[in-house]
Amino acid sequence: MRTHYCGHLNKSLAGQTVELCGWVNRRRDLGGLIFIDMRDREGIVQVVVDPDMADAYAVASQLRNEFCIKLTGEVRTRPESQVNKEMATGEVEILAKGLEIINRSDVLPLDFNQKNSEEQRLKYRYLDLRRPEMSDRIKLRAKASSFVRRFLDDNGFLDIETPVLTKATPEGARDYLVPSRVHKGSFYALPQSPQLFKQLLMMSGFDRYYQIVKCFRDEDLRADRQPEFTQIDIETSFMTSDQVRAVTEKMVREMWLELLNVDLGEFPVMPFSEAIRRFGSDKPDLRNPLELVDVADLVKDVDFKVFSGPANDEKGRVAVIRVPGGAELTRKQIDEYTGFVNIYGAKGLAWMKVNDRAAGMEGIQSPVAKFLSEDVINGILERTQAESGDIILFGADKANIVAEALGALRLKLGKDLGLTKEGTWAPLWVVDFPMFEEDDEGNLHAMHHPFTSPLGLTAEELKANPAPAISNAYDMVLNGYEVGGGSVRIHNAEMQAAVFDILGIDADEQKLKFGFLLDALKFGTPPHAGLAFGLDRLVMLLCGTENIRDVIAFPKTTAAACLMTDAPSVANPAALEELAIAVTVAKEKSAE
């Protein structure tokens, strides 16, 4: 039906007759001529309809926004004075010769010329996607997916599909369950990742695997999470963690170069412990110059228990952030930041303004200065390299609370005060994660997943002292977002059973949930390692937006609902009966 896309027309086609299909973006009547901005997925071009073309003019007179039309016309260059530099096709226009209405449109429930609510946009997503901004994002996503496939194909990886209906295994989040009609009372689980299947593919000898795959997690949502998301899943045999990081870093660097013409440069590598110490986060945004500085040794002997208590607690921490120019913050602003850190469990936010460094104690303004000696204050000023006009903000509590609260405050201050270098890129690798993390009851949980290999330990050594073990894991971080994470996997049954034991998974449960994996590990399993990228998050960064819903064609809300299709919905009673499922929600509600 068409010979060209609207957005592809240029001066080289002047004089040629073209056929276009698309939508009326805008229609204007000017001095007898009708002008139509015609739009398709590739862009917009101006169409001129002259009254001399009677049939086309009669049709053009009926057009309204979002009518679907077909146009036949001649490409002509615009006079220099009429060139529209705001349009990619602004040097040309189409003189209409034939015009056909393919389909009319009702008045839209969305106004493309103003900001619509997200609820309206999601309810009428098929209309929202017509907006050039949204169309460009979805096209960039397609280019990113195409690039990934091309890169991995060229590097010897095989695209292999893994099951979607599978077995529930503990991977950190709740599973989406699918009832079996054939095996009544039993359920499949939708995969949170293809983790075990890709490891089994390595045991099958496929060496290098990849898949762009849907994954499902029933977890609390936020701006950069969805119940169903897309993963670039990668696994390799006979490659070290350094080699896996090298090939995946190369992929991301070449992707940014091809799609954005940006050279990310070589990624620095930072141990987990350093990331937490300096930035309070295992995914630090290095565009932000603010850092956490430990001062526990300076305040451990002061009479102020708010500081000395955590400073002398092996699980405590006292750290500060020096904010350049922060002495200008008002008391109201400081109170607002205090309320902000309260969200993360901090009990307060002590502060110290350095109004005049040269004036000694006279130049210091702080509600806690009276509890600190001049030597302690000078020690803090020297360690933080504070200057006149700065403010120092304190965190003193359990180490995890201090890291989380000051880490979040660091990001907020960076944005609020314009310290974060927007429009730049700061990638890095975070490595050497703890193997386990401890809950409030003292139980150990896998920080990544239970198939991650420890670094430099035998099974016996790990079982003897598991808490301080370091895992052979690595995360790729970009501008404060974890865009990919992976590890070297456990490749022998003894080590895997040891990890399960440490996590409190007894022998019977191991056999029930992971018997197939433990069996497979007995048959000459190769060393293997891998990594998975969140495609949605990568594309979100490529597009310069902060919400992955902006780069998914048909996303869910933060309540995991689809406003367009009204999913999830109540199931047909006959279908539930066939599945031997009884719904108790209504009974529970009536009982309340």
UniProtKB/Swiss-Prot annotation:
Gene Ontology terms, MF aspect: aspartate-tRNA ligase activity; ATP binding; nucleic acid binding
UniProt keyword annotation of Cytoplasm present: yes
- Record region (Aspartate): 195-198
Q: Per the UniProt entry, what is one GO biological process? A: aspartyl-tRNA aminoacylation
Q: Which residues bind ATP?
A: R217, D218, E219, Q226, E482, G534, L535, D536, R537
One GO cellular component term, please give it. Answer: cytoplasm
Q: Kindly list the positions annotated as binding L-aspartate.
A: E171, R217, H448, R489
Q: What does it catalyze?
A: tRNA(Asp) + L-aspartate + ATP = L-aspartyl-tRNA(Asp) + AMP + diphosphate
Q: Which Pfam families match?
A: GAD (PF02938), tRNA-synt_2 (PF00152), tRNA_anti-codon (PF01336)
Q: What is its EC number?
A: 6.1.1.12
Q: State the signal peptide span.
A: none
What are the alphabetically sorted keywords of the record? Aminoacyl-tRNA synthetase, ATP-binding, Cytoplasm, Ligase, Nucleotide-binding, Protein biosynthesis
Localisation per UniProt entry = Cytoplasm
EC class of the enzyme, as a word = ligase
Q: What does this protein do?
A: Catalyzes the attachment of L-aspartate to tRNA(Asp) in a two-step reaction: L-aspartate is first activated by ATP to form Asp-AMP and then transferred to the acceptor end of tRNA(Asp).
Question: NCBIfam families from the xrefs?
Answer: aspS_bact, PRK00476.1
Task: Identify its protein family.
Answer: Belongs to the class-II aminoacyl-tRNA synthetase family. Type 1 subfamily.
What's the name of the protein? Aspartate--tRNA ligase
